[in-house]
Amino acid sequence: TVLDQIDVDTCDADGENAFFVADLAMVYRQYMRWVRELPQIIPFYAVKCNPEPLVLHLLAALGLGFDCASNGEIQSIIDMGVSPSRIIYANPCKASSFVRRAASQNISLTTFDNIDELYKIKRFHPKCKLVVRILTDDSKSVCQLGIKFGAPLADVPRLLAKARELELDVVGVSFHVGSGCFDPEAYRDALCRSRKAFDMGREHGYTFDFLDIGGGFEHDNFEAIAKVVRSALLDYFPDHEFAPGGSLVPSGLR
């Protein structure tokens, strides 16, 4: 057995270094679960979920995109030889130095939720395509991200008007219902809000073709969430490019 092959001398109780036990087959099975339940969605893995190089290499080989929130995360993906076109800089409030770095790395897609961010992007990365992050109801989630990120729908017209004034290219909408979401209907509500944001984009002369549906997917109720997402997408959207966050790893790495 595998246990019989463990070198007890190098794994004794006095060892000073921690380690993870990884089942990459589980990561692959989680990916296939995505393909089965949400075949119309292009997965973008949130690197912050687990930046273990073996996991990242596997997901890159499977063709996933990557959701990065920092310069370090972006660099780790680029160092693997992944094209910058497969990266979304999903941090809506970045330091000016981060925006300059993204421009130098040819990152062409990022999120925003405030006017100050638009001014920074106009100054340091004006050719970047933008995704407006909207606020959703994350009250049923373990980790509620709405206290930090996301523009209320009432603010979206003002943001889009400023983006148009600055001649910036807004291409879509993103949201996050919060990590550890136990209410599948939260996704329907978020997709309904996203539809309204798409309509606001059209009113400001934009044609959105990108929707990032965030993360929050739980292992135990993923099929229930996927059912709601499929139904809501049929109700509110035609065939767009959709990007979920990072639910491929939690059950595969301990």
Where are these regions (language model features)?
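Conserved radical SAM core fold
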Residues: E73-Q75, A95-F98, L135-I147, V177-F182
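Short beta-strand segments
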Residues: A46, D113, V131-L135, S174-H176, ...
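C-terminal active-site-proximal or functional interface alpha/beta core segments in diverse enzymes
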Residues: A186-R254
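Conserved anion-binding
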Residues: D113-D169
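Internal alpha/beta core interface subdomains
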Residues: E165-S179
